[in-house]
């Protein structure tokens, strides 16, 4: 029997997706009208997604709050948080839900057939039969609610989405993205914020929330996607019999309307908050935005990806260079958003000034006119096409399942025309078309039509306002106080009662019989086998080579690892500057823009990084190895070009180019500032660990706050510091880029080894051979600071860290289970559910470093108190066998992620450099699979050791940090 014999469905379309080694089928469920798309192939990492078109009508965030809420219990799975139960106890390779400006999607992935079916079941039940109709507590917890602990207390607002969006609105980049979208589409769903504006979220009522679900969460408005190696007939039958056949086809008005084009460009000015001590000079964002056709034009969809590369994204691209040369901003970037119905092309200048607006527009338009008149750089176009085609063919999405990313891309057309779901999956003919157009004037015509003649655009200015956060907080507090003052005693008592009831609901544990309904695997479903390690030590041209032999589809993945021992502590930031500079600065034979194009015409790209390794057999010595790594990938016949370009970058870069160095420092400063607002939790944890860990101090000095402080100092005092900077860069390059300082990591199939060895032989003896100073071990000095960093953010990132091995507690595999237990039980319940933070996590590694962190957290003192309570929680840890199994399975899920060829090679090399043997991994896996509750209780000592270290760092709002100033040894503005 085949899917054609299933009477419940009508087959509308089939496609041979040979480039993706898949067969595509589009169906419609006859009774309910549900749209279904299958991608059949031999990928064991199966994906299921159900999505809904959910255009918002206001900025109350109802699509986002709904996305959170439906995963908080359903008809068949009435536990309070089935999502967390699945995270804890499934072998998922992806499990999440996402709200977009016009859709909400619920994807899951797993390699285990039984687990995959369980995930599908819970998600289908969640979206169609959520418990949101039973009571309003989920809405109040995930969305918003008034919080009043006692009649005389302060009235506040809490809610997970509310706090998440307060964090999102604290970032100028977040403000910019939102205002650009809103500015271009005043008459459709893109005019409002689907995630929710914190000022508007409290306008949403419970009844409006339920109405949104009734309207949009119906099979007639659904898009169901199945990908991978599975019995599609069985899945389709199950979907029909279990869910879809319960519904009749209903008309659902969820159409995304096209915005009528503007007759002239619009201008929008919006403020964002900076800390009271920050300068408002060079802190404005300017954005030039144009609407580019629709996402249903597959040629345009890819052509502007290429133009984004050629005009803006590549180092030295003409728009970027023109704006930098004109001094309009210090960090120029491009953005091409083709994930909405009408894609948006943006030119963004960061660290500019408001009065530069006219110059910004003039430089962009004059540069574009010149490009149209004299022609675009053809090599840049070819490089852009090759870059995107290489990525399409390689299909390396890092940690994300391939099928997940294909599914999300399907929505780029399927959502707007249900007859065209596959147009972006068949990209090779489009790439061939674009290659043929390079010399025809096609791309110049696109620039003229869509960027110069097109009046459907906007200029967006995001400018700083000192103390805006404090002012808005005061306005909200005054508004809430006025509201409270207007209430009768009975109404105030009702608020106190509602607050208490929500807290009691959050304290309640789900009934054991309800928890038992969540399907879980047993330990017996898990293999004790570890993933293979692919390390074979060889020698090539007098250099150690570690070969990772796996099937790579004809691509060779190369990394040159240069040892950094002997670089003194005060020069560590300069290593990172060198790493950032190489590849985007002129070389002897290429201007940096041409260098980048040459690389991307012939290869899959070259990048650099700094990595840290430690001998896990000698953790008490606290010794570690730092390496400067240059990595690249290319097809085997292009290995000689790859190595030639690597050598060009390492040996021929012009490290004395003052103008370019100044531009790069400004860009680095801007991007580090951004990362503190988007990834403040990792920044805070690293900084806190650096108080006592030499390895963490190295990392902070090269990638954290310590590094930022040096970059900022160099950028702001460039004229007096430039000679020292250049001398350091040259000296470090000469000291490290040497054949006697090198190990090579190479991932390929057996037949890819010879081309690599031949290519490396041509450059091996051209690395530095000058006599170098005798290297002395780098001594790193750690200082305990316990810092609070004030920012313009409305939320906190709270980190508590320590080293448990220093206090005599050994590492065990059970600590990996503890990460799951804390992150999805103790911390989740207390920091997220009750505290309202968007995220919380923990980590413990083989060298004894541990941390507890919160993310976009409205609290500070309360979170620290929760951290202090973790030891008592562990001492009293007591769950049934089923729950214990769940924690173990969730732990294995984090370990057993499917790996692409590049990941198999890099994992193997990582184990090699850290001296981790197969026996150690096997022992850790057995410790996880054999763990008992007593093993978890014994870990109270680990947490006690961590807390006894008294190391903490907080990045957050001025107000909260000043309120708790006695907590810190130092308070600074970031």
Identify the function of each model-found stretch.
Residues 1-47:
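Non-catalytic terminal extensions that flank enzyme cores
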Residues 40-42, 49-51, 162, 166-170, ...:
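His/Glu-based metal-binding/catalytic segments typifying zinc-dependent metallopeptidases
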Residues 45-55, 81-129, 136-147, 174-199, ...:
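M16 family metallopeptidases and their MPP-like homologs
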Residues 62, 66-70, 578:
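Active-site His/Glu-centered metal-binding helix of metallohydrolases
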Residues 94, 210-214, 273-276, 319, ...:
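Generic recognition of flexible, low-complexity loop/linker segments
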Residues 150-219, 225-243, 247-275, 280-282:
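Hydrophobic, small-residue-rich alpha-helical packing segments that form membrane-like cores
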Residues 158, 210-242, 704, 726-760, ...:
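Non-catalytic, conformational "gating/processing" segments within enzyme and secreted inhibitor domains
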Residues 211, 223, 232-251, 374, ...:
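Extended, regular secondary-structure scaffolds
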């Amino acid at each position: 029997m085949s899917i054609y014999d299933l009477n419940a469905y009508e087959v509308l379309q089939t496609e041979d997706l040979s480039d993706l080694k898949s067969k595509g089928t589009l169906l419609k469920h006859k009774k309910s009208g549900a749209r279904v798309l299958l991608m059949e192939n031999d990928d064991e990492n199966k994906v299921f997604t159900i999505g809904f078109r959910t255009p918002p009508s206001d900025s109350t965030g109802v699509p986002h709050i709904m996305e959170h809420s439906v995963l908080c219990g359903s008809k068949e799975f009435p536990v309070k948080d089935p999502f967390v139960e699945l995270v804890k106890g499934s072998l998922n390779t992806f499990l999440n839900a996402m709200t977009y400006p016009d859709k909400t999607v619920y994807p899951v992935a797993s390699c285990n057939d039984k687990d995959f079916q369980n995930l599908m079941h819970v998600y289908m039940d969640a979206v169609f039969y959520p418990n949101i109709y039973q009571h309003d507590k989920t809405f109040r917890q995930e969305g918003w609610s008034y919080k009043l602990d006692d009649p005389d207390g302060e009235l506040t607002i809490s809610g997970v989405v509310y706090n998440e969006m307060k964090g999102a609105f604290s970032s100028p980049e977040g403000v910019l993205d939102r205002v650009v979208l809103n500015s271009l589409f005043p008459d459709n769903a893109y005019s409002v914020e689907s995630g929710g504006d914190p000022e508007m979220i409290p306008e949403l009522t419970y009844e409006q929330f339920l109405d949104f679900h009734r309207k949009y969460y119906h099979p007639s408005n659904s898009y169901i996607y199945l990908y991978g190696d599975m019995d599609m007939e069985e899945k389709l039958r199950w979907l029909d019999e279990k869910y879809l056949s319960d519904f009749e086809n209903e008309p659902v008005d969820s159409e995304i309307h096209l915005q009528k084009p503007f007759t002239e460009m619009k201008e929008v000015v919006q403020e964002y908050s900076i800390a009271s001590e920050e300068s408002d000079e060079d802190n404005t964002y300017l954005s030039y935005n144009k609407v580019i056709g629709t996402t249903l034009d597959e040629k345009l969809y890819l052509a502007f990806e290429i133009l984004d590369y050629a005009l803006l994204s590549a180092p030295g691209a003409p728009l970027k260079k023109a704006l930098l040369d004109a001094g309009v901003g210090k960090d120029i970037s491009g953005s091409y958003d083709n994930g909405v119905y009408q894609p948006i092309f943006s030119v963004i200048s960061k660290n500019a000034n408001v009065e530069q607006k006219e110059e910004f527009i003039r430089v962009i338009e004059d540069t574009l006119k010149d490009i149209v008149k004299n022609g675009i750089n053809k090599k840049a176009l070819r490089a852009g096409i090759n870059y995107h085609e290489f990525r399409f063919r390689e299909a390396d999405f890092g940690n994300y399942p391939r099928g997940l990313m294909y599914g999300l891309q399907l929505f780029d057309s399927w959502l707007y025309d249900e007859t065209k779901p596959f147009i972006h999956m068949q990209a090779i003919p489009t790439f061939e078309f674009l290659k043929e157009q390079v010399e025809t004037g096609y791309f110049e015509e696109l620039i003229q039509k869509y960027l110069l003649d097109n009046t459907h655009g906007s200029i967006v200015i995001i400018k700083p306002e000192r103390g805006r956060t404090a002012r808005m907080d005061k306005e909200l507090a005054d508004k809430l106080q006025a509201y409270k003052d207007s209430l009768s005693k009975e109404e105030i008592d009702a608020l106190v009662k509602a607050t208490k009831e929500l807290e009691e609901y959050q304290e309640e544990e789900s009934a054991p019989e309800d928890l038992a309904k969540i399907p879980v695997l047993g330990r017996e479903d898990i293999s004790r086998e570890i993933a293979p390690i692919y390390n074979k030590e060889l020698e090539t041209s007098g250099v150690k080579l570690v070969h990772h032999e796996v099937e790579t589809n004809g691509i060779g993945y190369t990394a040159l690892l240069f040892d950094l021992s002997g670089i003194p502590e005060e020069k560590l930031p300069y290593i990172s500057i060198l790493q950032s500079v190489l590849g985007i600065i002129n070389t002897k034979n290429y201007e940096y823009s041409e260098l980048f194009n040459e690389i991307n015409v012939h290869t899959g790209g070259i990048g650099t990084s700094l990595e840290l390794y430690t001998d896990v057999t000698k953790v008490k010595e606290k010794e570690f190895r730092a390496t400067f790594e240059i990595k690249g990938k290319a097809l085997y016949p292009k290995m000689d070009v790859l190595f030639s370009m690597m050598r060009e970058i390492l040996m021929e870069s012009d490290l004395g180019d003052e103008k370019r160095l100044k531009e790069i420092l400004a860009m680095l400063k801007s991007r580090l500032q951004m990362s503190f607002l988007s990834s403040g939790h990792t920044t805070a944890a690293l900084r806190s660990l650096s108080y006592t860990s030499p390895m963490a101090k190295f990392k902070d000095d090269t990638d954290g706050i310590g590094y930022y402080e040096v970059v900022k100092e160099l950028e702001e005092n460039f004229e007096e510091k430039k000679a020292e900077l250049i001398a350091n860069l040259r000296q470090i390059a000469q000291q490290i880029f040497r054949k006697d300082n090198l190990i090579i990591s190479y991932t390929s199939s057996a037949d890819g080894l010879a081309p690599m060895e031949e290519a490396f032989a041509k450059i091996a003896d051209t690395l530095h051979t000058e006599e170098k100073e005798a290297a002395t071990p780098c001594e790193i000095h750690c200082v305990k600071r316990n810092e609070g960093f004030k920012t313009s953010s409305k939320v906190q990132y709270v980190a508590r860290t320590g080293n448990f091995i220093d206090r005599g507690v050994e590492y065990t595999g059970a600590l990996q289970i503890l990460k799951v237990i804390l992150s999805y039980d103790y911390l989740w319940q207390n920091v997220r559910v009750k505290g309202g933070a968007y995220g919380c996590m923990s980590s413990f590694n083989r060298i004894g470093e541990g941390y507890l962190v919160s993310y976009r957290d409205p609290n500070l003192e309360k979170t620290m108190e929760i951290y202090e309570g973790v030891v008592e929680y562990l001492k009293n840890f007591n769950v049934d066998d089923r729950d214990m199994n769940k924690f173990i399975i969730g732990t294995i899920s984090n370990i057993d992620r499917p790996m692409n060829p590049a990941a198999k090679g890099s994992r193997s090399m990582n184990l090699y450099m850290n001296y981790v043997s197969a026996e150690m991994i096997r022992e850790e896996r057995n410790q996880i699979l054999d763990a008992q509750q007593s093993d978890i209780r014994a870990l109270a000592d680990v947490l006690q050791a961590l807390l006894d270290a008294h190391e903490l760092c907080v990045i957050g709002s001025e107000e909260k940090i000043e309120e708790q100033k006695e907590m810190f040894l130092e308070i600074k503005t970031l």
